[in-house]
């Protein structure tokens, strides 16, 4: 699939990043892949070595990774009986492992250019986590960015947390590394075919994030079936493409078109520029590498807006 994606990307850069969910059970305090458990300190170096070996094996097959997260949702591993793969870290232990093990190992094995991301968890956690991990000079050296997930964004709508991360660490990027619809316990219908509210929710979140220093946004799933799986932990959710294998067909969801619309106009290397508006439309503007200006607009209201764009040339 990766090779196929590379052939279809045309001239755009193709960036892969990897995210571990759990070390092998025998390396962990609870001897399980899921539930409340932590990486045992005696295996800190072995786990770092695994990262390097993972990258080398892909490299041997002509697949290069752009980035890594240190751990997917490290807070999940603090939750007793957490249902699927997880491993707990706090900011202190993650800093220690990166400084003493992961960072030096990636550097010595020829992967110093890999973009290492910390946190990879919910937005409200980001300011404190980044502040504490990056308080160490060596951690600052090894870490390139902060990964953020969207799952609490509509419950705790605090985009200024992203501003805080940027203001305190302007040389570290912020990347949204995971998002999907149908993830909440109250989402009784996990897959909703043709639901444009879910497409609008994607665009709303992307515009909000881009206006608060986020540099990219990633969906969790490429494609799922009509149930929102397969998923061994019964964690069913929605996806931009839904496949009906019994009929040999697939559906492009509104979320697919939402992502496609933004991706078509907002290309890699674009720089966000200032924008003011006098109505309730959601908007973000970028100057592209080809010097064109791209403006992404979202109208979530039932009435129409008439829009006039005024731009200025700076010489």
Language model features: what each stretch is:
Residues 173-258, 274-277:
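Aromatic/acidic polysaccharide-binding cleft in carbohydrate-active enzymes
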